[in-house]
Amino acid sequence: MSKKKIATEAAVIESYTVFYSGDAEKISPHSKGLLTYELGKEDETGSLALRLTANGEGGLFSREWITLDAIHAILERQQDSFPSRVFRSLFGQGSTNNAGFLAAVLRSPDICLIEADSSRLFMHHCYADWQHRMTQLAALSQD
């Protein structure tokens, strides 16, 4: 009986309305296919989140929703160049690909919060105006 209750609570927690869907190129030049992601608004609280929904080449990844507030908190702590692994703590489960895939989405032209470090492909740094860009993403949910 408690299993049903847990399943019901999980369904409520995962209740998001998707307001944007997009594609992102993977970071590695050797990887093929695109990553597909969604931006959503949690129905009860109104919090905004992002999740991966497809990997064009197949392979493991997590479909869990990651709040924009949690992403903001991670980015706020980055002073210099940083690796994708800083995003690992955002995922409760799944593949080691998750952090790198999230970084790829955050680099994508439609999200555009971080960019490649000029000297190291797999390192990132935040755009100077990333917080303003985050506000613009939130505004998409109002349209």
PLM feature segments, named:
Residues 61-65, 77, 81, 96-100:
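Generic alpha-helical scaffold signal
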Residues 66-71, 76-91:
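Short acidic, hydrophobic short linear motifs in intrinsically disordered regions
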Residues 2-63:
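Long, low-complexity, charged/polar intrinsically disordered regions in eukaryotic proteins
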Residues 107-119:
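A short, conserved structural fragment
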Residues 125-143:
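Short, amphipathic alpha-helical interaction segments positioned at domain boundaries
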Residues 119-125:
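Minor-groove-contacting beta-hairpin "wing" of winged helix-turn-helix DNA-binding domains
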